[in-house]
Amino acid sequence: MPMSRPDSSVQLLSDYSLRAHNTFGFDVRARVAARIGSPEQFASLARDPRVAGLDALVLGGGSNVVFTRDFDGLVLLDEIRGRALAREDDDAWYVEAGGGENWHAFVEWTLAEGMPGLENLALIPGTVGAAPIQNIGAYGIEMKERFASLRAVELATGEIVEFDAARCAFGYRDSFFKREGRGRFAIVSVTFRLPKVWAPRLGYADVARELAARGIDASRASARDVFDAVVAIRRAKLPDPLELGNAGSFFKNPVIDAHAYAALRAREPDVASYPQPDGRMKLAAGWLIDRCGWKGRALGAAAVHDRQALVLVNRGGASGADVLALARAIQRDVLERFGVELEMEPVCL
């Protein structure tokens, strides 16, 4: 797949503002930053004495990070572009995209090219390269279900390494790259397997309701119909980061065992929950937060969104420390009332 900017030379940018590179809009600065347009540029930095010894952070869309201070290291801005059908067989298309490609634009492109399968993941903020790190998911599907492989540069050596699904060790909003591999690799491209036999994923009531509101019979819904429905739902529920700084869902939906769930339901009969294949129950974190009275509330300029309790927002002038303080107050209240620990989705730095 062709990659943008084949030149391996890298310009370093000192005292670089990251305000435009994180969706909360925090005005923090990086000691050094570099715009990366090719795998070769990532590799060249491994041998560059100008950045030797600096901690490195790869940023795509900045939609999964909370900066609580300036970053005293090297920020690598992933701008590797390109998308193409890499190959196909009788069963599936294998589509490769550069790590710096906008995720939503990539999903829309696959549909335009007649290759459905990612439509439930429409309008998730961020880049293609960030999708495996977080194992993004929405409306009944996770990225790992469509994942084939990825290529990543090991930052210490400049070596390009291939990862299959097993090596990525995907979990719920989790992967190897959020744990042991954190800070060690930069994802340069991802290949997705999109099955040629397609059926809509309509397990979430919101999607079925939106299709019905549009006069579409769910049994006859096309991939584009599902895409449009998901986009409409997300736009109605979630604020645009360009208008109100946020990082999407701030907390993971907690999963508890059957015994803990039975005890919780005895106290809270209407708790919003979803059964899991292993017998455990996934709780709706937004419901827990709302029940604690946090929806629409604020601590200074950091607030809980008034339409979606899972989303924390920067109303203007908030710092990462403000958002983190709000998140911890919410975690404390949910734990005290329900005995359930909420885990943050974004990385806090």
Curated annotation (Swiss-Prot):
GO CC annotation terms, alphabetical: cytosol
Active site: 173, 249 (proton donor), 345
FAD-binding PCMH-type domain ranges (all copies): 26-197
Enzyme class of the recorded protein, top EC level: oxidoreductase
Catalysed reactions, as listed in the record: UDP-N-acetyl-alpha-D-muramate + NADP(+) = UDP-N-acetyl-3-O-(1-carboxyvinyl)-alpha-D-glucosamine + NADPH + H(+)
Protein keywords: Cell cycle, Cell division, Cell shape, Cell wall biogenesis/degradation, Cytoplasm, FAD, Flavoprotein, NADP, Oxidoreductase, Peptidoglycan synthesis
Cofactor(s) needed: FAD
EC number: 1.3.1.98
This protein's pathway: Cell wall biogenesis; peptidoglycan biosynthesis
Subcellular location: Cytoplasm
Signal peptide residues on this chain, from the entry's feature table: none
GO molecular function (one): FAD binding
GO biological process, one term: cell division
Domain of life assignment: Bacteria
Gene3D superfamilies assigned: 3.30.465.10, UDP-N-acetylenolpyruvoylglucosamine reductase, C-terminal domain, Uridine Diphospho-n-acetylenolpyruvylglucosamine Reductase, domain 2
A matching Pfam family: FAD_binding_4
Family the entry assigns: Belongs to the MurB family.
Role, per record: Cell wall formation.
Protein name: UDP-N-acetylenolpyruvoylglucosamine reductase
